[in-house]
Structures are given as C-alpha cells and as structure tokens.
Regions:
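Active-site hotspot residues in diverse enzymes, especially metal/ion-binding acidic/histidine motifs
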Residues: 1-172
Length: 172
C-alpha cells in the first residue's frame, strides 16, 4: 500500500526540522489568521494571488487549533490542484467519506504523532488506549488515524481499539 502521505510528512519534517504545524506553515510562507466569523467552521485554506492562506476559528482550544493547522497544511501539501479551484472548508474534521479530508487527517496524524513516540509510549503496558492518548497529548480520534497509518505501513503490533469518529471535532 502507498506510503506517500507518510513520506511527504517525513520529507517536510527533515527539511524544516520541526513537527510544529505553525512553524511549518510559516516556513512555507503560508499566511495564518484566526477569525471569529464562524460558529461551526473549524478552519479552511485557500490560494489567492499565488499565496496560500489558512484561516482558523478562534473559538477552538489550542490543541484543536494545532490539529486544524496540521490538517490544513495537509491540504496544502497534498491537494494543491484542488486549492487552485476552490477553498477547502472544514466544519467537521475526521471525515472518512471524503478522500481529501481522509488524506489531510492522515497527514495531520503522521505530522503530530511521530512513529517513535507512539512506539515508545505504547510499550508501557499499564496504559490503556485513552491514557496513551493523554500521555501523547492528543485526541483518541487523531490517534486512531495514526494507528491506521502505522498498520497500513506494516506495523502489525498495533490494533484499532476504537472506530474513527468522523464527526469528532464537529461536536460542541
């Protein structure tokens, strides 16, 4: 199975020496802004006059803003052609029905959760799935995408302890 999303994340991390989505967006000259204009829209990205923009709703927690930034970075890195036509708006992250959203979620999980951190932390047999997520400062939903990525790449020691909730960030 193709590893292009994981490889694209690792190439970006090697080049810029960071996994921080905001630092990566800055290094790529992407304009990032927060807005209070939307009640349900988490974020979106678009291309205008050869400049990429990421807009993130300011009602989100810092953790959610980081996930949305990584997700939108995924769109910029993986879906440039689609961005030339129309903005990508994300009212619900973790959407499994739309391939572009699915890919952006995998990108965000691979960016924010390094394989080594997951492998090291998951060796602690005292941690259940939710404790693992808490220890790695992530959501169970994003961890599900990371585990799926690991399994897809042949890491059979992992299993999916919960189903992916495509409406996770859509809940208030």
């Amino acid at each position: 199975m193709s590893n292009y999303i994981f490889q694209s994340v690792e190439k970006l991390v090697r080049r810029y020496q960071t996994r921080d989505p905001f630092k990566l967006l800055d290094a790529l000259n992407v304009v990032v802004q927060e807005t209070d204009q939307y009640q349900h829209l988490k974020g979106y990205c678009f291309l205008c006059c050869k400049t990429y923009y990421v807009i993130i709703s300011d009602f989100l927690s810092e953790e959610e803003k980081r996930i949305v930034a990584a997700h939108e970075l995924g769109h910029i890195m993986l879906h440039k052609r689609q961005l030339q036509v129309a903005p990508m708006k994300d009212s619900v992250l973790y959407n499994m029905r739309d391939n572009t959203e699915y890919e952006a979620n995998l990108f965000a999980a691979d960016l924010l959760l390094p394989d080594e951190d997951v492998a090291h932390t998951s060796k602690n047999e005292e941690l259940n799935y939710f404790s693992l997520c808490s220890t790695l400062y992530t959501t169970p939903e994003l961890m599900s995408f990371k585990l799926y990525s690991l399994i897809r790449r042949g890491n059979s020691q992992y299993n999916m302890p919960m189903a992916i909730d495509s409406k996770f960030l859509g809940k208030h």
